[in-house]
């Protein structure tokens, strides 16, 4: 079982008592008590698991570069992290999720990441192929904590009460371009594909943001658990997502072909 450290896991060492991850990135400058990011290869895919509770993007950049250097022949480069930077849930997508967006989007783009698997929003979302816009954006460093965390209370209060700040914050997080809106099967696409999983256990669900974001190709909240099945071959990455209770697909199939 290869898991990412979640926001409810990061403040204690309990996670480390349950999981013995391969290739832990011990060079992180601001790790959380739960541990570090790590990486592993499976078949022709390289999986890089980020501890996104650490808001120091330089650590994640270094981990990605190290993983790629040690696995130069991996056909597929897949990042896994708990926080979603391109989701569609009401509680996180427009707050702590996008505080990481301006930092991680160009890093993923520069390192030719194919897919980013995310959670956190307790709702399902699938994006188009996205690239960095190549522009400089505010990283809102005043809300980062010394240990690599994020000051949610101060940020949330200002975001809620200060309309000018809220508008500026959202404008700075328009740090992406939609590279390809094709559906079904895309061949040698530009950009990165982001998938946000809903709860697989049904422990908690969040509403979707009322207005679907332009980067979202499909989304769902039926208030029931769902799961995704990913099939990776030499030349293809395919994802299908199903309702746990009924077994029915909640979204159309999406395939990336790399020749």
Residue ranges and their predicted role:
Residues 6-7, 82, 119-120:
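Active-site glycine-centered loops adjacent to acidic/histidine catalytic or metal-binding residues
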Residues 1-73, 77, 103, 129-218, ...:
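Extended active-site neighborhood of metal-dependent phosphoesterases/phosphodiesterases
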Residues 115-117, 223:
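Functionally important transmembrane alpha-helices
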Residues 90-98:
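Short, flexible/disordered intra-domain loops and linkers
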Residues 101-112:
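Catalytic-core regions built around general acid/base machinery
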